[in-house]
Structure formats: structure tokens, C-alpha cells
């Protein structure tokens, strides 16, 4: 994989420190259509996002798009989120500390690629300082705290923070080539160059005064021009008093210009001081970056831990603000939701006037539910609500309900809305049939299937026939491929309600 990336990206892949193997069976499958229909990003993400770091926000998106199918992992997330939920003071103090932590993952990637700037390094130092405070805060949790156990290995970066503090100015320029980065006292050679650059006028004045005393020539002057550089100018009346080490440089009508080995050396230092300063600072900066890069694995580990803490604290904040509850996750086939609410619609209504709903699918209840009702009755909202609550539960989040018990779902399939694909030459009906066929061919007994108005893209009776056939196929188990798949089917075809007379699962 790394070789492939190196060949295709045409750049260094040094920032990739490890590749984690992902077992697909441990994650819920959400296809593009389901993600779009449920509007996970940005709508659900917007409701749950109380993260304080860029890393946490990025991880929250990843978790919402890949819910878990591992009960132990889900319960671990619930337990840590529960600690934040139960302690408002801990939640607020952690949020304050997290707010001062920068995007360490991206900074470390730039460091690995040697594409970072001085402000990245200062941002890293500030992050290290906040991590230390956050670590102290979490260490104050009870001894058996899972949160304390998890974050205890995040690492102490006091040494790196102190090194950066000694080396880099608090408000450095953006470009590493501009100089003005390294603090005074960090490097002796650089201090000498800086002293030359900053104190050259004072040094030249002292040299002029010393040469006046040594030669006894009061009119002796040290001057500069771009052609000849620095020189000592003496009038012709005083030529007899010049010291032996003076070397003639130029003859004028009324004066002679000289230089000394000392002045020549200092001239070179003064004229090259700015260039040398920038070069030295660049070398010292690169050396500092390499020192930080040597700790990249520890820093990446800490960054990941910070992101996880941020997301779990965000779950707790959402649960406290919106009155969510911790769902029970089981290996069964039930979805039992008492007084469930659509998280996004409820949020947009400012929590006023939303009618909650109970849901009982599987686990002794019917596996297939057919919803009928007039337009604007809330059918689409309800079926999306069930899917979102299931998804949130398997993400490790609390859910909008009074009580919830969710049997693991390996996939969520949706067929919602009407749209065509003109670029592919597909009509609205064609798109609808392709998506429905995809569901019927790929769903499993542990899937959750959401179907809204299947058959709407054609004539009434043809649509009714299609809807009837789809439900019948699901109820018959599709040749056992999806026997027991939990299904919500919203429709205007009231004729479908007779199916409960034929099938016990409706």
C-alpha cells in the first residue's frame, strides 16, 4: 500500500507511520444513498457536534459514517461518554482545555513532510501545554474511571514543550526563510551573528574612536559606500600619522581611504550577517523539527486520544442538552424505542411541539411494518427517525428517546425520495428500481431497510404491483437471504394493509 501511494502521489509518504487493518464485520455498512437520504453529514453531525478540536470534529464525522457492530466497543464508548454526562464540571473543564489544542494530526503530517512553518511549532507547544492540564484534570477522576485508564497513556510532552519554548519566539513569522524565529540564548553562534547585525553601528563607532586615539588623528572617519564597502578616510594633511597596518584602498583629491584586517573581517561579517542569520535560523529550525519528528508516534497517539475524548464529551454534551438516553445494545433482532424523536427535526423545531413515537420491530413483534397516511402526516420523518436512532446507538451516542433497546444492525438501506440521473440516462423510475434492487440483493437478516413510497415513479396500478412484490419478497425471506430483515415501508397504497392477513410478520 505504501509503495502504491509513493508511486501515485509522487511525493513523500513519511507522515504515514502505521496502517491499521479494518475488519468490515466490525462496522455497519452505509452506502452513499443511505448517507444522503438520512442526511448524516451535515444535519445529524450538526446536531451532535459539540467538539472543540478539529481532530474531534473530523473523528465525529468518521464515526457517524461508520457505526460499530461490536457491542463491547459500543459499550466502551457509552461508558466514557457516561462519565462526562454524569459530571458537568468535568465536561466544562475538559471543553476549556480542548479548546486550546490545535490540529496536531495535520501539524505532524506537515512536520513529517518538512512542510511546516514556525507557527505550527508554536501551535504544537500550546497543544502540549493544554494536554498536560487536561491530563491532570482527568487524573483527578475516581481511581476506577475508564476515562482515566484510557487517557493515562496519552504521554507527557513537557520536554518537547520546554525545548520549543527555549528555541522559538512566541510570535514568529509565518515563513521559515524570513528569519526572526529563534530566541536569543538558544544558540551561541546565532547570538553572535545577531549581535553583529544589530550592533554593527555601535561597533563601528567604537572602532572609529579607538583608531582616532591610536593614530592621534581626530578627523579620522569610518565610512561606507556600496562600491568600496567600509573604509577609514584620512585627510592628506594627516597622512604622516597613519599606523603601519593601514592598507590603502582609494586615493581622492583631498583624502586617502584605507582599511585594516580587522575592519575587513568585520565588513564581511556585517554584510553577510543578515544572510548568515537566516541560514543559521533555518538550520536550527530544521534540526528542531527533526527532534519533534522523532517523537511522532507518541504525538499521533496523543492526538488520537484527544480526538476520542473530544467526541465522547460531545456526545455527553448533546445528551445533556437534548435529553437523550443511553440505549441498550443487544445481539437480538429487536428495535424497541419508547417516545423516540427525530434528532434533526426536533432540533430545528427548538424542541417544541415534536410528537414522539414508539417503535417495536422484531424481538417478538413484526419484522415488517407498513405505514400509511396522508401527505405531511410524518411518515418519512418517522422512518428516518428509526434509522437515525439506530445509527446513533451503534456510534456510541445517547439517543433521543425515553428508553431504547437496539439489536445490532449490520447495514442500513434506504430508498427515499425521487430523483433522476440524466447524465447516466436514468429516469426517476429507473433510479428507483435500481436502488430497490440493490437493497433486495444485498440486505441480510440483520439489516434495517427503510423504503419510502416505492412504486411512485410509474402508474398507480403498476406502482402498487411493484410495492406489493417488494414487500412480499422481503416477507418471504428472499430465498433466506434477508429473512428477518427489519423493514419500515411507508406508502400511500392502502391496499397493502391487507398483507397482515397473509403474513404474520407484518
Name these PLM-found stretches:
Residues 1-83, 96-99, 103-109, 116-209, ...:
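Charged catalytic and DNA/RNA-contacting regions of genome-maintenance
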Residues 252, 256-290:
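Extended, charged coiled-coil "arm/hinge" scaffolds of SMC/Rad50-like chromosome-maintenance ATPases
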Residues 44-49, 60-65, 176-189, 248-257, ...:
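Short hinge/gating elements
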Residues 50-53, 57-63, 235-267, 308-506:
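ATPase nucleotide-binding head domains, primarily ABC-like/P-loop NTPase cores
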Residues 202-222, 323-325, 342, 350, ...:
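Flexible, glycine/threonine-enriched loop-and-boundary segments that flank and lead into catalytic domains
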